[in-house]
Amino acid sequence: FYWTGIIDDKLRVFDIIMYTEFGTTYNSYVMKAGDKTVLFETAKAKFFDEYLEKLQEVIDVHKIDYLIVSHTEPDHAGSVEKLLDYSPQMKIVATGCALGFLKEIVNRDFVGIPARDEEKMVIGNRTLRFLFVPNLHWPDTMYTFIEEEQILVTCDSFGSHYCLPEVVSTAINNEDDYQKALKYYYDCIIGPFKPFMLKALDRVEGMDITMVCTGHGPVLVGDRIKSVMKQYREWSTVVNPNPRKTVIIP
């Protein structure tokens, strides 16, 4: 299992509205499953040449068998169109919603496999289980759990715009900066969808997970996994919620 992402340490504004004082990463992962090659996520199109070099270090880019697309924002799926030039045979697995978006984005034919919630897919010697988590933070989003490795690929959940060249959370050496980036990212990306985040946490907190492969920022390992999930639950729990609709007439 390999990290093949992009480090964007000079980025200071993301999606026009988010400040990224610590830069960010666009995380992508390669899994070799016996005789099959599986790619999770891609990178922004502007970084494609650098991204291609990263991939070529570990795989033959002409022989990608599957691409798992967690969600179709350009920072996750921006290189799909160009990758199809190298591996037109690769099968793209995503939610039906994501495949619909992707067809409009790449504007070309590809082999799409619509995943189903809680469905298991055996690829080579690995088993993938898909968990639909709509509105985290797009309607097309899903997580993927690699059962043999106990790795959870989580798209935008549990991530941060925090550039860490060493990639893994054990390398974090400035906890205050990381916590600042983690909370700000949550507030901007996940915060508007708290009920959906709580539903996702109910599904994953009890799982045996050795690694959380985020879309941005450090890959979470060890105690960091449960600590970040605990923070997400605290932040997503609304105190004294009012379930009734209220209209104020001045």
Regions found by a protein language model. Give the residues of each.
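Active-site metal-binding motif and surrounding structural segment of the metallo-beta-lactamase
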Residues: K36, K46-V93
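Metallo-beta-lactamase
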Residues: T37, V93-T214, L220-V221
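Active-site environment of divalent metal-dependent phosphoester hydrolases
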Residues: L11, F47, T72-A77, L99-L102, ...
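Terminal amphipathic helices with adjacent charged low-complexity linkers/tails
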Residues: M211-N240
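Active-site neighborhood of phospho(di)ester-bond hydrolases with catalytic His/Asp-centered motifs
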Residues: F40-T42, K63-T72, I92-G96, L152-C155, ...
